[in-house]
Amino acid sequence: MYILSGITYSYSVRGNLLLNDPEKMITEVEHFKRAGGGTICELSVVGMRCEAHNPNHLVQISRAAGVNIIHGTGFYLESFLPKEAKLLSVQEMADFMVGEILRGVGGSDVRCGAVYIGCSWPLADSERRALQAATLVQRETGEEAGSDITIFLPSHIL
């Protein structure tokens, strides 16, 4: 067996998580549409969002490229969460997610249409609370909620 050094996943480089170049993103989404795609789920939840996260860019991209973009709410793996998010109670997490669904993300008018929770194994305390909160959110809003507990290295972000 050979061990290769220097190989990383795209999410390991913080810059790969930036959604701050709408023109470049429109071009990429147009490729997706030409290949037959019609809807993208943008699941940059708490722990994956950075200061450059701008949900209004998603509106611009959706309109320009002619695809649906569903923004997600939720909490990512505990190791990625800011300190204050790690300390939230189940109810505080639920209230935050309901707010993003009913009122919008980060002061924008972009409302979330899905709940995504990052899970590692064994579940960290904040991940367990986030899963519990997601059940409250789904019960209150009817939004889709999910997590893939079989994925430890989230290659689905590639």
PLM segments and residue spans:
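Generic recognition of short, well-ordered alpha-helical segments
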Residues: 53-56, 129, 157
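Conserved beta-strand edge residues that scaffold enzyme active sites
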Residues: 46-47, 76, 152
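Alpha-helical scaffold segments that flank or form the walls of functional sites
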Residues: 2-67, 92-110
